[in-house]
Amino acid sequence: MASNDLKTWVSDKLMMLLGYSQAAVVNYLIAMAKKTKSPTELVGELVDYGFSSSGDTRSFAEEIFARVPRKTAGVNLYQKHEAEAAMLVRKQKTYALLDADDDEDEVVVEKKSSVSESRKSDKGKKRFRKKSGQSDESDGEVAVREDSRHVRRKVSEEDDGSESEEERVRDQKEREELEQHLKDRDTARTRKLTEQTLSKKEKEEAVRRANALEKDDLYSLRKVSRQEYLKKREQKKLDELRDEIEDEQYLFGGEKLTETELREFRYKKELYDLVKKRTQDEDNVEEYRIPDAYDQEGGVDQEKRFSVAVQRYRDLDSTEKMNPFAEQEAWEDHQIGKATLKFGAKNKQASDDYQFVFEDQINFIKESVMAGENYEDAMDAKQKSQDLAEKTALEELQEVRRSLPIYTYRDQLLKAVEEHQVLVIVGDTGSGKTTQIPQYLHEAGYTKRGKVGCTQPRRVAAMSVAARVAQEMGVKLGHEVGYSIRFEDCTSDKTVLKYMTDGMLLRELLGEPDLASYSVVIVDEAHERTLSTDILFGLVKDIARFRPDLKLLISSATMDAEKFSDYFDTAPIFSFPGRRYPVEINYTSAPEADYMDAAIVTILTIHVREPLGDILVFFTGQEEIETAEEILKHRIRGLGTKIRELIICPIYANLPSELQAKIFEPTPEGARKVVLATNIAETSLTIDGIKYVVDPGFSKMKSYNPRTGMESLLITPISKASATQRAGRAGRTSPGKCYRLYTAFNYNNDLEENTVPEVQRTNLASVVLALKSLGIHDLINFDFMDPPPAEALVKSLELLFALGALNKLGELTKAGRRMAEFPLDPMLSKMIVVSDKYKCSDEIISIAAMLSIGGSIFYRPKDKQVHADNARMNFHTGNVGDHIALLKVYSSWKETNFSTQWCYENYIQVRSMKRARDIRDQLEGLLERVEIDISSNLNELDSVRKSIVAGFFPHTAKLQKNGSYRTVKHPQTVHIHPNSGLSQVLPRWVVYHELVLTSKEYMRQVTELKPEWLIELAPHYYQLKDVEDAASKKMPKGAGKAAM
């Protein structure tokens, strides 16, 4: 009986070939394919039945012939070996095998000599004892049986090598087929987010029609169809009632009607008026509409602006008169407006009378002044700003472009690009390198033969810069100018200037190793030396040698350009001065114990005492920024209207795009803006109006120990180069000040000169997998600018081999090629690939998405910590483990239709959940790309746990007598993180997501496992002695029950 999948496939093919399909025809074709002996014979029979003799019919016959199951005669391997051995013995009576040195496969035989026969017989006599009456045939049978054992042993040894080689070749062939399928899918799916697509109604209709064949959706489709019909029926009946009233008025207008007829007519009319009024009330919804600030000529529509002033004096129209509560609602709005707390709007000059004195204010010492360079005086800058205010928005943008320092060197830059294939460009931050160079290349005609790609180390920078360039060019974002980041592709076929993260360009190299669609590649912010940037250096260097027509520009904001030049074969350096105003550097007189509190106090002191000008503060991450924002709002609220308005604008990677754009909005007159940023604001973003910089002197850096496999995100002191970059932010538009929350002694003696490249301090497993996918196998000799530790590379190769991504020759397997498609850690990718075997891929991608967003899912307000902990533990009911708890969180949120209120009630960060949903949607699309079916097995949680263990089996630990855990491989004492749901249960065996180093070595995201699973899922990694659980050993009190 053919499987359902085969029947569905044949049915689809019949629809394509003939235009119809029936179950009987499908079964008949499958039976016919089973009976035929070759595809050619099947083609002949199909043509006889009416199929066209075309290539489509031939390919259909070949595919169905290959797909249908066939009956094969079972062969007894033992009998086969017995027969082969008997044949060899018979041949050996006349032939003997001689050793041949030239080829293993060639065997030279010749006649046996009498001496060899006599020796053979002698040996036979010694080996076998004849019984009385035993015939020669019995001796022959014994000899055959003995020789057959020898032959089987020899054949099995040869088969082990040949089977492993055949398996390797088969796996390589399957991997090549998978890569070809991926390329075909990419070619077929050319539509992007910004292309001209169907309307919303057409999309909904297309989706509804596509799902119409799904039996599970039939009920919901019927329900939706009935609801839509009721809406149409309501409007239809309303029109019929109106027509009926009009007809009766026309026909019986002058006639005398009875009382019953009059009552019925009045009833119809009242009913129609009520329904009509309700419809008008529903249509009259109060909503905000984005105002059009400028007309087509670029000027302000003054009449529209001043029409608001006379709004209260105009007469009400007919629709407003129908609202009897309009006056009441207006009065309520007025009263609510008076009762609303407002502060900062009066703009009192309180500093003229007195100054605030903060109890915990900090004493700063003016140490030095950073000299300015190529800057304008205050009068010229003020006159230029007045001139810009009189121009239209488009003229203002063009004038700003011409005022950038790089504009003076435009022609020289284009000439240098034309004369040299590789060019190193050096210019200060804010000089216009990122926004202007791609536009200059576009204007010079480089985009006629390919795109101009510009990489950025951060997602926020790629999005904001692309939006700015699109605005300057006067085009819509996503058309001529677009961006591509990890979970968003805002490009189209029209895109010629493409901004992207360096990681996205690495992923593009998987499908296009020679970057054939690009004419120019710009590696921007090269001085940051991120992991992806260092890998790109080696790849684009080889591509530039292979493609002489490709232009390669390396852009940096620091003067350490000689190193880049030497790496790229002594490439020429094009440097130009920026515009930098003098910056006063202030250090604290004594070290600060709490840099968070010191930063808050410094912000308030600047806001109260210093002249107007925006403030930029550097923090290490999102958590610190949100904490500082909360404290600032609380303290400002206490000061009320005594101080000017302070606008707080955070900026970090996970912040939504609309909130990120607020940092670029001009500050209202009389107010001050404070930007709370990560180190993204050092070089990637340029914010106008910044006059004061507060530098705590710390940043978050990844640190990886290849021996223990522990990767931690540590808060570490910045380098002197980063400190200089941060101080330079204050001198962009006017003379400024930088407040460093550390002493001058710390700066001179404790800070490193430059930041350690990320490639030397992070886990390289995903990078090694990406390079292997690109066909780069000699990783030790890969052309790194700063080579990573050899031990880290070896550990990464060992991990990938253990995960099955590499074979014993170091070649990429089909599973490894699938894993490379997922933008995740290799162990997470392996977990997803294995989930296809256990039919739980739907649950696993939800867990992977939740793990990818880190530990920012639950939050604990200081005043409601007990409630938050109880809400979190509700998801751990039954000691299911942290992974299953994350799955419960996402599933529960999905069941509430992604409710924001549900997140508030359960103390879950809705922003993190939305990001997890975006990640999951992308992973779901990648499942189809790598040919993995989406399946669900929520009732069988052991299948989910086995998939987790299959990906994270190197991360296992066993409970010790003292209540701590010991990792099985590379023994190390670790503990379950206090936030884990199993921190009090203490199971005997656990698998963990990652190790983090805080006050102790903690395991995060822990799930219980059965030790026998390790032998089942990773027999190549674990032996029986590794997982033997001595049940007789005494465990600590309160230890968890045995593994499930």
UniProtKB/Swiss-Prot annotation:
Residues 122-132 have a biased composition (Basic residues). One of its GO terms (cellular component) is membrane. Residues 157-166 have a biased composition (Acidic residues). Residues 108-121, 167-206 have a biased composition (Basic and acidic residues). It catalyses: ATP + H2O = ADP + phosphate + H(+). Its EC number is 3.6.4.13. Widely expressed. One of its GO terms (molecular function) is nucleic acid binding. GO terms for biological process: mRNA processing; regulatory ncRNA-mediated post-transcriptional gene silencing; RNA splicing. Residues 414-577 form the Helicase ATP-binding domain. InterPro entries: DEAD-box_helicase_OB_fold, DEAD/DEAH_box_helicase_dom, DNA/RNA_helicase_DEAH_CS, HA2_WH, Helicase-assoc_dom, Helicase_ATP-bd, Helicase_C-like, P-loop_NTPase. Residues 106-206 are annotated as: Disordered. PROSITE patterns: DEAH_ATP_HELICASE, HELICASE_ATP_BIND_1, HELICASE_CTER. ATP binds at residues 427-434. Gene3D superfamilies: 1.20.120.1080, P-loop containing nucleotide triphosphate hydrolases. Residues 600-775 form the Helicase C-terminal domain. Involved in pre-mRNA splicing. This is Pre-mRNA-splicing factor ATP-dependent RNA helicase DEAH1. It comes from Arabidopsis thaliana.
